[in-house]
Amino acid sequence: MPELANKLKPVDSEKITINLGFVDLGHIDLLIAEGFYSNRSDFIRTAIRNQLERHGDAVRQSVARRELDLGLRHFSRADLEAVQRRGETLHIQVLGLATIAADVTPDLARATIASLHILGALQATPAIKAALRDRMH
């Protein structure tokens, strides 16, 4: 088995698909043609950032209330082994990207991760995702 198969590729974004009406799409294309945006992705990213900024206070309050880790949170094998030695379990709550190292075994993940609530994306091997499926909210 190639070594690359054992490693997770770092990602900095997640691809999404949306359905738009033809008139809305035409308006976007017109703004691109007029030079307001470089392409459709630029328009959509800008629109999303503007909406997130518009609701920024509510988002910040919700993040604090829910006690979410914001941004990137990585869980290495050493991290989880330390949790296991202490006889503890983790309740992982992340707004952003949570990653679990490729060398973490499904048994170690199940022994140390009691629950996962990810608002954003989880990057882990398919075996880890399958092992934790019943703990994801």
Q: PLM features: residue spans?
A:
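Detector for repetitive beta-architecture
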Residues: 67, 72, 91, 97, ...
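Short amphipathic alpha-helix starts
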Residues: 13-30
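Short, positively charged interaction helices/loops
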Residues: 53-86
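Short, T/G/N/S-enriched strand-turn elements that build extracellular solenoid repeat scaffolds
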Residues: 63, 79-91, 102-114, 130-136
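Short, basic amphipathic alpha-helical segments that act as recognition/interaction helices
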Residues: 2-9, 26-27, 38-62
